[in-house]
Amino acid sequence: MAPRKPSKKVGPQKRPSAEKRVITSKKKQLRNQSFKSKVRTILKKFELAVQSGDVESISAGLRSVYSIADKAVKRGIFKKGKADRVKSRASERACPAA
């Protein structure tokens, strides 16, 4: 019988379902990271609008913050409390400026 090639993996070998789970979790992680990055970008744009003091851009930014936070909850990326906290802080920042 031919000698077996040494495995590159350390530890027990994974079953096909476990390998698939690793692959899908990595895909989901990339998707979530991308979406969280989008959320942070929108929050930064909103913060710049608040600093500029332009009422129209503040209200548009606040709408986009609310929308993206709700989408994050719908997709399971944020919990409801986290989204509520993000929206609350954004509205606090918008009120003195508006």
Swiss-Prot record:
Alphabetized Pfam families for the sequence: Ribosomal_S20p (PF01649)
Q: What's one GO-annotated cellular component?
A: cytosol
Q: Where is the composition biased (Basic residues)?
A: 1-12
| Alphabetized InterPro entries for the sequence | Ribosomal_bS20, Ribosomal_bS20_sf
Citing just one GO molecular function, the answer is: structural constituent of ribosome
Keyword Ribosomal protein part of the UniProt annotation? yes
Q: Which domain of life is it from?
A: Bacteria
Q: Which GO terms describe its biological process?
A: translation
Region annotation (Disordered) maps to: 1-31
Q: Which UniProt keywords apply?
A: Ribonucleoprotein, Ribosomal protein, RNA-binding, rRNA-binding
**Function summary:** Binds directly to 16S ribosomal RNA.
Matching entries from PANTHER family are given as: 30S RIBOSOMAL PROTEIN S20, SMALL RIBOSOMAL SUBUNIT PROTEIN BS20C
* The family this protein is said to belong to: Belongs to the bacterial ribosomal protein bS20 family.
Name this polypeptide is given:
Small ribosomal subunit protein bS20
Q: Which organism is it from?
A: Chlamydia trachomatis serovar L2 (strain ATCC VR-902B / DSM 19102 / 434/Bu)
> Encoded by which gene?
rpsT
